Amino acid sequence: MPQDLSNPTECLKAQFAAGSLHHGLLFLGQRLPSVERQAMELTRSILGIPQEQNLHPDLFHLRPSGKARIITVEKTRELIGELNRSSNQGGAKIALIHEADRMRKEAANAFLKTLEEPPGDTYVFLLTTRPYSMLPTIRSRCLQVRLKGEPDSEKCEEWQEWLKTYEGWIHGLLDRESLKKDRVSPVFAAYGLTAGLLKIIREQADQQCEKVLRELPQILDDKEKDALETGIRKGVRSDFLRQLSQKTRSIAVEDSKNLET
């Protein structure tokens, strides 16, 4: 069963200090940047990396790359080779596998033995927002840590204002008498809402990309960078659409209750 923790780092740090930290952790969350930040916080503690730094000779990253945004078996084998070498600093080694759900079946199978029997003092942190897109054999060999976190979009004032306008628009559509008098205005309002939504998503995605790329713990090649940006933009869009779906559902439920009373 996944651990359900709003901030797991203190608990996991204590497990590491006690020598009981599981060698394979699967970090689950709704937003990859948030998952990565919390996994990196634990990584810094284990490897003794200062807060303002992200690099360490015993820290290795594996990311999707290319237009297909996949983790290839070739890159996976390179990581396995690094983990099987002696520690550069004489301590622990950590592998961060970003968007682990993007591992191709061949890559996941190649990594399975390392996950089952990792080299001594080696930890593997798999990060994902889509755990059920991973091979069950990979998931079952990890301690799952479910992370809670408020999406950045919920802090966006422009988005909150948009939701208020959207709610008013929906209520207007549900008002049959008002709709009989004016069927044109709601159509034009829909165009405005759509344009506003696309603008907010684009701006939030741009900000998230800039922030993540600025904080990257390593220099990426162009294929990895393109894959990362694509993943961030898809994640931001999915987050907004998820909230929009929830808002629409809550309005419909509220309206049905009002009809019953």
Residues covered by each model-derived region:
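Flexible beta-alpha connector loops of hexameric P-loop NTPases
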Residues: 67-73
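Structural motif
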Residues: 94-96, 125
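Residues immediately C-terminal
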Residues: 102-103, 117, 133
